[in-house]
A protein has these predicted regions:
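N-terminal secretory signal peptides that target proteins for export/translocation
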Residues: 1-17
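Short beta-strand-to-loop elements that line the ligand-binding cleft
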Residues: 106-113, 211-220, 258-261
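Short helices/loops that flank or line small-molecule/ion binding pockets
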Residues: 116-130, 143, 177, 221-241
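Periplasmic-binding protein-like
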Residues: 80-81, 155-164, 251-289, 299-319
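Bilobed "Venus flytrap"/periplasmic-binding protein-like clamshell domains
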Residues: 77-100, 134-135, 155-226, 233, ...
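N-terminal hydrophobic or amphipathic helices and topogenic motifs
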Residues: 35-117, 299-355
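Ligand-binding "clamshell"
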Residues: 140-152, 246-260
């Protein structure tokens, strides 16, 4: 046989063996880390096996092993994709510029296109701090080691929002039960205002999602709102703060819609850091957030909020967890995989409509 062919086969064999050994080593390391985590953790609660909650505050503890602490030269920040991510990159620019000076690190804004992508980014270590929508915050805590610490707010309280059920102003619908058999847009499977809360609260009002109407996922709150305005949907449950911001920007006219139902108040998006940040960096980051006061353009964008108001997941997200549990929602790995599948299907359906 030709020596060149033999040489090529030998090289190929060596590369294959090396690849197999590498994959085996990675697999064994991951298994060892999981086993180590299980052996060292006395309480995990609802958290993924990668995390521990020994103080029972419902969020991941900082790793005991200092070798696992992260102190990146560049901090990656993002904000929930409730609307166009590019809009929020511009809105947060004064803050990210400040955060860079405050921490002494380069800060970049990472645009995410879905809640699942944002959660995955923190779980994989690519995201260090970010704003998570109200519902997805639960997944971020349990499956990505996110530690919520703030909500937009004022001097005395955090900023909340309501779930609005909106219809066109000239539609015949006057109450929730009138929407049986109609086209109702939900936002995303993980959205509190756009899916979880409606599923938990609507049955008592005479309307059962997926039974009295087929749930149509729009992908984002602005898609639902614009869709109702355009007549693509008969109604949609949306976050009141998004609706008000779109009206304030002139993207919609509030008078073109009617609100036929409004929920109790929920906290708006949480800001959370990765659980494995080096403690000194974490404390610096928290101080930077809490000391910051929003400039005029940010106050306008966020309905008058002027700061990051301190919260805890255990206390301030209790109402969100209660509503989700009332609707049968779980925030575990199986539910998350189902969430990713539904979000991917919703995105594909939306893209197909545009063609």
């Amino acid at each position: 046989m030709n020596k060149a062919i033999l040489s090529f086969q030998n090289v190929t064999t060596m590369l294959t063996v090396t690849l197999i050994n590498t994959l085996l080593a990675v697999t064994l390391m991951a298994a060892a880390q999981a086993a180590y985590a299980q052996a060292e953790c006395t309480n995990r609660g609802d958290l993924d096996v990668l995390y521990c909650d020994e103080n029972k505050d419902l969020v991941a503890d900082t790793p005991k092993d200092a070798k696992r602490h992260k102190n990146p030269s560049t901090l990656v920040f993002t904000y929930t994709p409730v609307e166009d991510p590019a809009v929020y990159e511009n809105i947060f620019k004064p803050f990210t510029d400040y955060l860079g000076k405050c921490t002494g690190k380069r800060v970049v804004f990472y645009q995410v296109q879905s809640n699942a992508a944002e959660i995955e980014a923190m779980r994989s270590g690519r995201l260090h701090v970010g704003g998570f929508s109200t519902g997805p915050t639960n997944y971020a805590v349990n499956l990505a080691g996110a530690v919520p610490f703030a909500v937009k707010g004022g001097e005395k309280e955090w900023q909340g929002y309501n779930v609005y059920m909106i219809v066109k102003k000239d539609s015949p619908y006057q109450k929730i039960a009138d929407l049986k058999g109609k086209k109702v847009a939900h936002v995303q499977p993980s959205s509190n205002s756009g899916n979880l809360a409606p599923r938990a609260l609507f049955p008592a009002l005479g309307l059962i999602p997926d039974q009295d109407y087929k749930v149509l996922y729009s992908g984002k709150h602005d898609n639902s709102i614009m869709g109702v305005g355009a007549g693509d949907y008969d109604a949609a449950p949306v976050a009141s703060d998004v609706f008000k911001r779109m009206a304030a920007r002139g993207q919609i006219k509030a008078e073109d819609f009617r609100i036929i139902w409004s929920s109790e108040t929920f906290p708006t998006s949480s800001f959370a850091y990765a659980h494995d940040l080096e403690p000194k960096l974490r404390d610096t980051l928290l101080k930077c957030f809490y000391d910051y006061r929003f400039p005029a353009e940010m106050r306008k964008a966020f309905d008058g909020a002027d700061r990051f108001y301190p919260i805890t997941y255990q206390k301030d997200w209790a109402i969100v967890r209660k509503v989700a549990e009332g609707g049968g929602e779980k925030f575990n790995s199986a539910a998350y995989e189902n969430l990713k599948k539904k979000e991917a299907e919703a995105l594909a359906a939306k893209q197909a409509q545009k063609k």
